[in-house]
Amino acid sequence: MAVKIRLKRMGAKKSPFYRIVVADARSPRDGRQIETVGTYNPLTQPATVNIDEEKALKWLADGAKPSDTVRNLFSEQGIMEKFHNQKFSK
């Protein structure tokens, strides 16, 4: 099963709010999810990002592929750097 870490859109029309979720790559954008990893609110200034770092690193280590936007959010939070250090230090 191909697993992705991606954004699931929530919120009302014209006011998006996203959950960062782990989902099967074949499921629809707002469909079934395996686990919620965090949240992202682009409307606040600056944008609010809350990520459970342990869950994110666990799923990355298990082979989940982040979407481009999630990869950028993880990089801003320093999670991708920790993952690469963890992966290549072995």
UniProtKB/Swiss-Prot annotation:
Any one Gene Ontology cellular component term annotated for this protein: cytoplasm
Family annotation (Gene3D superfamilies): 3.30.1320.10
What is the superkingdom listed in this entry's lineage? Bacteria
Record-linked Pfam families: Ribosomal_S16 (PF00886)
Q: Which InterPro entries match?
A: Ribosomal_bS16 (IPR000307), Ribosomal_bS16_CS (IPR020592), Ribosomal_bS16_dom_sf (IPR023803)
Q: Which UniProt keywords apply?
A: Ribonucleoprotein, Ribosomal protein
A GO biological process this protein is involved in? translation
A single GO molecular function, which one?
structural constituent of ribosome
Provide the family line. Answer: Belongs to the bacterial ribosomal protein bS16 family.
Designated name of the protein = Small ribosomal subunit protein bS16
Organism whose genome encodes this protein = Lysinibacillus sphaericus (strain C3-41)
